[in-house]
């Protein structure tokens, strides 16, 4: 009990330290360097969260912190409670460590921004809402964190609001996430009606309807940018590079996967939902890996690699291995944040140049950035004994030894091979060869705010996977025996991708005509955005115009409305007037005939 109290106290203290910078203007009258103060608070919060992690590693005890009762609706009660279990205790220190590096990098990258203090506040709120989402013990609190990361992503992606592309990307992100939120709210409504509780313990004790589970999958599809709701993720690169690093490493994009991991006790018994999750993730990881190969923007390549890894996490959830998916979230956070920080360093040093075709030879001028970029790319490939190896290798082993869909297995292995191709492409174009940029670019790595966070994340990339896998008890079934070729499958696939990447990169030095159809398909992202963003509005506007002209104008106005009434009256008046010819003899004759008939009948 004493161990649990110490762990809970440290966890609450780390959250309080995150709130202090947000209240700084209300509590302090002294003028200090606010961005530096925020960075120091994040560092202290990380240090404060380490005892909870160490105690959990030593004792393995989980707890639920219930602070106060919020409100009641008849017999429906909602309390403020935090669930400190395996997932939240491990994830919070990793998120704090990565955010600490990103905030320190932002001191260098955003130093000339006039609103840098507001920028740091937004980043801290972004992190805080993600921690609320991870540690929530009920759906209402989880929904607050869920919506919080969505709102903060909108504000941070559109940070440079003077650029129309940034505003469009921010709107695109929030609109795609609204679709996912519909699924989440559908599940919440079903649980309120059928379970009469939003507490996770009560939810896990009942059987959920497939419609409610499908709502969770839709929510994860929108938030984690799975296929069909994926275009917002590469567009989010219009925001500042620190935003991209935080967004892709440990906050918003992994929130959808974390939601499925949290609700996995409900998913594991429904094979249909697991199959949907498996196939959706496999399709996402292949499509985005193919798109990454044809991109020339360094941030877009890293963004598509994130989407591909999210698809791999979704595949792992579909394999009924949630702890492996969580392990990949943790290892992925280190090298993905480092890749974005290295990209930001290169972009900043090359006067905001993002095209990898205009780079080259940076290994000699930016050695620390280049070494970290190469380390992160190798970890992304799944190179042995780096962070990505411990999770990707286990995922592919679990997939090869499970009774799963061979179609999903095949395209996931192809996507893993493509990962090596686009990772090698970044290394080849940016670090090797001759410089292809202007010679007057002020290249330097003299600022410690640039070097220190990259070095810390590089150390995490090298050692985090080993530390996580050796100190945490395995919470999933391990395949003890397997054929040698299955054990070596991940390494063979990665090696094949490396060889293909080297061959493709060597072809760029030769004058060869490319296949325009394949090139256009992948460069235009499968024409998905053109179809969904242009065809649907075109169809809506066309149908609206046709309905307005055919139904309202032609039918109502011309047949039943004023014009129709005018036509009826004009025909009636013409009929009456046509009977009046103006012939006096005819009138007298009709009068005479009428008089004769009257006399005869009377």
UniProtKB/Swiss-Prot annotation:
Q: Which compartment or compartments is the protein found in?
A: Mitochondrion inner membrane
**Its family?**
Belongs to the complex I subunit 5 family.
Keyword annotations for this protein, in alphabetical order, are: Electron transport, Membrane, Mitochondrion, Mitochondrion inner membrane, NAD, Respiratory chain, Translocase, Transmembrane, Transmembrane helix, Transport, Ubiquinone
Which catalysed reactions does the entry list for this protein?
a ubiquinone + NADH + 5 H(+)(in) = a ubiquinol + NAD(+) + 4 H(+)(out)
Q: What class of enzyme is it?
A: translocase
* Species this protein is from: Didelphis virginiana
Q: What does this protein do?
A: Core subunit of the mitochondrial membrane respiratory chain NADH dehydrogenase (Complex I) that is believed to belong to the minimal assembly required for catalysis. Complex I functions in the transfer of electrons from NADH to the respiratory chain. The immediate electron acceptor for the enzyme is believed to be ubiquinone.
List its EC numbers.
7.1.1.2
Which Gene Ontology terms cover its molecular function? NADH dehydrogenase (ubiquinone) activity
Keyword check for Membrane, yes or no: yes
> From its record, what is one biological process in GO terms?
ATP synthesis coupled electron transport
Pfam families given in the database record: NADH5_C (PF06455), Proton_antipo_M (PF00361), Proton_antipo_N (PF00662)
Record flagged with keyword Hydrolase: no
What are the TM regions of this chain, as residue ranges? Answer: 9-29, 36-56, 86-106, 116-136, 142-162, 173-193, 202-222, 241-261, 273-293, 301-320, 324-344, 361-381, 407-427, 450-470, 482-502, 582-602
Q: What is the membrane topology listed in the Swiss-Prot or TrEMBL record?
A: Multi-pass membrane protein
Choose one Gene Ontology CC annotation of this protein and give it: mitochondrial inner membrane
- Under which name does UniProt file this protein? NADH-ubiquinone oxidoreductase chain 5
């Amino acid at each position: 009990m004493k161990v649990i109290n110490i762990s809970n106290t440290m966890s609450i203290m780390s959250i309080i330290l995150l709130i202090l910078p947000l209240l700084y203007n209300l509590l302090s009258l002294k003028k200090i360097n606010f961005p530096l103060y925020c960075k120091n608070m994040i560092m202290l919060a990380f240090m404060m969260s380490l005892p909870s992690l160490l105690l959990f590693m030593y004792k393995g005890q989980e707890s639920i912190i219930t602070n106060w009762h919020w409100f009641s609706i008849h017999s429906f009660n909602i309390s403020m409670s935090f669930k400190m279990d395996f997932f939240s205790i491990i994830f919070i220190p990793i998120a704090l460590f990565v955010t600490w590096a990103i905030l320190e990098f932002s001191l260098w990258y955003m130093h000339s921004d006039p609103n840098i203090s507001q920028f740091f506040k937004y980043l801290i709120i972004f992190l805080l809402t993600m921690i609320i989402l991870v540690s929530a013990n009920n759906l209402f609190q989880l929904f607050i964190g869920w919506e919080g990361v969505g709102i903060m992503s909108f504000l941070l992606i559109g940070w440079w609001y003077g650029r129309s592309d940034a505003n469009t990307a921010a709107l695109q992100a929030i609109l795609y996430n609204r679709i996912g939120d519909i699924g989440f709210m559908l599940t919440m409504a079903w649980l309120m009606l059928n379970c009469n509780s939003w507490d996770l313990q009560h939810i896990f004790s009942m059987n959920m309807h497939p419609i409610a589970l499908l709502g969770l999958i839709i929510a994860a599809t929108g938030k984690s940018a799975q296929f069909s709701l994926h275009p917002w993720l590469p567009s989010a690169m219009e925001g500042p590079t620190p935003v991209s690093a935080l967004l892709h490493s440990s906050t918003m994009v992994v929130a959808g996967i974390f939601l499925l991991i949290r609700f996995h006790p409900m998913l594991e018994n429904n094979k249909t939902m697991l199959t949907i999750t498996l196939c959706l993730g496999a399709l996402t990881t292949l499509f985005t890996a193919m798109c990454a190969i044809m991109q020339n923007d360094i941030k877009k390549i890293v963004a598509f690699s994130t989407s591909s890894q999210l698809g791999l996490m979704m595949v792992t959830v579909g394999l009924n291995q949630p702890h492996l998916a969580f392990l990949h979230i943790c290892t992925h956070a280190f090298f993905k944040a480092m890749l974005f920080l290295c990209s930001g360093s290169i972009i900043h040093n090359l006067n905001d140049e993002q095209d990898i075709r205009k780079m080259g030879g940076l290994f000699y001028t930016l050695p620390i950035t280049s070494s970290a970029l190469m380390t992160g790319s190798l970890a992304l490939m799944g190179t042995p004994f780096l962070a990505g190896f411990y999770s990707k290798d286990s995922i592919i082993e679990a997939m090869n030894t499970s009774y799963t869909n061979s179609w999903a297995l095949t395209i996931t292995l192809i996507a893993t091979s493509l990962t090596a191709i686009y990772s090698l492409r970044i290394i080849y174009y940016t670090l090797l060869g001759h410089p292809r940029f202007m010679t007057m670019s002020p290249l330097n790595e003299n600022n410690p705010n640039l070097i220190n966070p990259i070095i810390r994340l590089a150390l995490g990339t090298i050692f985090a996977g080993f530390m996580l896998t050796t100190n945490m008890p395995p919470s999933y079934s391990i395949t003890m025996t397997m054929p040698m070729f299955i054990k070596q499958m991940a390494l063979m696939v990665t090696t094949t991708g490396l060889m293909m990447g080297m061959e493709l990169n060597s072809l760029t030095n030769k004058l060869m005509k490319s296949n325009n159809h394949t090139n256009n398909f992948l460069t235009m992202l499968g024409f998905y955005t053109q179809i969904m963003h242009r065809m649907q509005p075109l169809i809506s506007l066309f149908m609206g115009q046709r309905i307005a002209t055919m139904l309202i104008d032609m039918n109502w106005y011309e047949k039943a409305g004023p014009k129709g009434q005018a036509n009826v009256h004009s025909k009636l008046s013409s009929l009456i007037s046509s009977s009046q010819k103006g012939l006096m003899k005819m009138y007298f004759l009709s009068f005479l005939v009428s008089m004769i008939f009257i006399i005869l009948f009377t």
